[in-house]
Design a protein with these regions (language model features):
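Non-ligating segments of multi-cofactor redox enzymes
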Residues: 1-176
Length: 176
């Protein structure tokens, strides 16, 4: 199986939110919609003094879980959310989604959003439209100024990370 993934190097992320802007532009998302987001953690060192005045960033998007809680939570039959067995990509069928928000609530990562105009869930699909057009990277990875986001085959990304001595956060029961 050639499972696709994003690898996000948290040591390189500067919190610039270029990935958010690229995703919104690529997917023509409105101001209240999101498929990814950058969360600022900690205190602002410019306004806070002291030992713990660090600001960290967490780039967050769908983890494309092995056992997605969002699929299990979807009350629609057939499910409005599915997982591609070959690529591992979890997608929302916006036409089938009833907009109940159960999947958004069930996501353990808070990685799903909601389109109030279309009344359906939205989430990262690893730029499926771009991939179908032959583009070999995601919008977020293509604009990241620090190359903190890499798109590719999951196993290759894990090898690269290990080769560079990076720690892997890959022990979540939803991801196994």
């Amino acid at each position: 199986m050639s499972r696709l993934a994003l690898m996000i190097d948290l040591e390189r992320c500067t919190g610039c939110k270029s990935c958010e802007a690229a995703c919104k532009s690529e997917n023509a998302l409105g101001p209240l919609e999101r498929r990814n987001r950058v969360i600022w953690l900690g205190s602002n060192p410019e306004t806070t003094c002291g030992e713990n005045s660090a600001l960290d960033f967490l780039a967050l998007s769908c983890q494309h879980c092995e056992r997605p809680a969002c699929i299990r939570a979807c009350p629609v039959n057939p499910k409005a959310i599915s997982k591609d067995n070959e690529t591992g990509v979890v997608t929302v069928n916006e036409d089938a989604c009833v907009g109940c928000g159960e999947c958004v609530t069930a996501c353990p990562y808070g990685a799903m959003g909601y389109d109030p105009n279309g009344r359906h869930a939205v989430k990262c699909d690893l730029c499926s439209d771009r991939r179908s057009e032959g583009n070999n990277t995601t919008a977020c990875a293509s604009v990241c100024p620090t190359n903190a986001i890499t798109f590719g085959l999951r196993e290759e990304l894990l090898k690269t990370s290990k080769k560079h001595g990076r720690g892997i956060i890959d022990n979540d029961p939803f991801l196994l």
